[in-house]
Amino acid sequence: MRVNCVGAIIFDASDRLLLIKRGHPPGMGLWSVPGGRLEPGETDEAGVCREVLEETGLEVEVGRLAGTVDRPGPGGVTYVIRDYLATVSGGVPAAGDDAADVRWCDRADLVRLPLSEGLLESLTAWGVLPPN
């Protein structure tokens, strides 16, 4: 079974990436971009906005598709994750929903923190990370 998911790649004015620490499986304890499963009938854009608001307290404007990855899940599930660039339009970062923590991360953090599998490689391959 394929499960459609979305994620948001959000940078601040200092080129730091917004990451959340997953509070529940899959990926509990790992840092990732905000995102999750689409609700039935929900568009990608609406899903990105909802997930970011639920997990971080931030309102966003959704930009272009950065890339897509397939991730295996339990019981033969495949998570099809479409990650979009987004910009903050309102709110103050605060962990919520299934996020245990939320923070702006620089390049050093991306190397040091335990990230979701393939996150750094995907962001690099898609060319969305700011220069060192």
Regions found by a protein language model. Give the residues of each.
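Conserved hydrophobic "DFG−1" position in protein kinase catalytic cores
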Residues: 10-11, 19, 86-88, 104
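Short helix-loop capping/hinge motifs at secondary-structure junctions, enriched
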Residues: 16, 91-94
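Nudix hydrolase/Nudix homology domain
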Residues: 30-31, 77, 93-132
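Active-site-adjacent beta-strand/loop module that shapes the phosphate/pyrophosphate-binding cleft
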Residues: 69-92, 103
